[in-house]
C-alpha cells in the first residue's frame, strides 16, 4: 500500500476558448473513483447534448495508478482527443481528476495535429487554473487505556493531529482514532514511551 500523500482537485474548473470557429469548453473535476469519473462525464454530456463531441480522460486514483485511467475520443479521429487529454492529466501529478472537453464544431476542420493541440491545450490551460489540496492517506487505530491516561493520550493525539472517531468509557477507556499513515510509527512510539507502555495500540480492522 502506497501511503504517500498526493494532490487532488479542490473545486471544478472551466476553461473556454475558440479555435477556428470551433468552441472548446474544458471541465476539470474531483472524481475519487472510476464510477464518479463516469458520472461526471455523463453530466457534462447531458449539459452539452447539442455539442458535436464531448471527449474525456480521467485519472481516478493516485496520479501514477494507470489501472484507474480512462479516455475517449467520442467520435473524433482516433488518438486526437482522449489520449492528449489523458496525457495532460497524467503529467499533472494530480490524482482523482476527470477532464471533459466539449467541442461545438464551427465548420472548419482542424486536422489531426490541430485537434491534438486543441484538446490537450485546453486541459493544459484549465490545469493552470486548478486549485489543489493534499490528500493524506489515513488509518484507524484502537487505543485502550486507564482513565488516568486520558489527558496524556488526548494531548498526544492533538500533537499528531489524530481524529477521535469513537470513544467508549467503560471499565477502561477505548478510543478509535484516525491518523495519517506516515505518522503511525512516531505516534505509537511516543504514546508508549510517555505512558510507560500502559496505552495499548492496535490496528482497527474496520477500515
Annotated model-derived regions:
Residues 81-129:
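Active-site beta-strand/loop microenvironment that shapes enzyme catalytic pockets
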Residues 1-79, 166, 202-207:
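C-terminal regulatory domains involved in ligand/effector binding and gene-expression control
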Residues 132-147, 175-177:
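Short glycine-/aliphatic-rich beta-strand segments at the starts of folded cytosolic domains
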Residues 116, 122-127, 195-207:
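Terminal alpha-helical anchor/extension segments at protein ends
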Residues 153-159, 186-195:
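Short amphipathic alpha-helices in soluble, non-transmembrane regions
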Residues 169-172:
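N-terminal positively charged helical leader segments and presequences
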Residues 177, 183-184:
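Terminal, non-globular segments
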Residues 143-162:
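Short amphipathic alpha-helix segments
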